């Protein structure tokens, strides 16, 4: 009888200790959260406006290059070799300046990237802070982002804490 009591006591202690090491998981959908943040929607609209403006500026500059080339081709028979060389250099120089402008606006460290950093990064930081607060408050070990490349074949909707993050952000 005593061995059974000891066995039950040992089993209970073992089960309780395993349960205390259980980790809590949750997930959020940052794409969903971002669509619910008005500042993000406004920032995206501003970025799209800048992008369209810069794109039309670049397209107009490329049209100038094409017009220069068509003019050169039509007048080529009348030009001396020295004049041809100058025109070709002029066209090449103009094309390089348009490519530089395109890189300035849309390059990896271009104006579009900087605008995105200025307008969207603060919103992403607020989301990150709210997720950290949620994790600390509810003692979550891991919070996944459902909108990232992480493949979630199944997730319990009760574990989706996106609305809680929005609430912590004041939305």
Regions found by a protein language model. Give the residues of each.
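Amphipathic, charged alpha-helical segments and their helix-to-coil junctions
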Residues: 23-171
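Sec/Tat signal peptide C-region and signal peptidase I cleavage site
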Residues: 18-22
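Bacterial N-terminal signal peptides
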Residues: 8-17
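Bacterial N-terminal signal peptides that target proteins for export
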Residues: 1-8
């Amino acid at each position: 009888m005593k061995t059974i009591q000891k066995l039950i006591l040992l089993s209970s202690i073992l089960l309780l200790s395993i349960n205390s090491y259980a980790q809590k998981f949750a997930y959020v959908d940052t794409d969903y959260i971002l669509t619910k943040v008005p500042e993000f929607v406004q920032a995206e609209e501003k970025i799209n406006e800048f992008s369209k403006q810069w794109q039309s500026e670049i397209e107009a500059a490329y049209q100038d290059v094409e017009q220069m080339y068509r003019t050169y081709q039509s007048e080529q028979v009348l030009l001396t070799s020295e004049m041809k060389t100058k025109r070709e250099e002029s066209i090449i120089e103009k094309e390089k300046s348009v490519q530089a402008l395109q890189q300035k606006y849309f390059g990896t460290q271009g104006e579009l990237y900087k605008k995105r950093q200025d307008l969207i990064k603060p919103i992403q930081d607020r989301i990150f802070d709210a997720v950290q607060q949620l994790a600390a408050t509810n003692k979550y070990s891991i919070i996944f982002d459902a909108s990232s490349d992480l493949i979630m074949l199944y997730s319990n909707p009760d574990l989706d804490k996106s609305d809680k993050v929005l609430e912590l952000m004041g939305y």
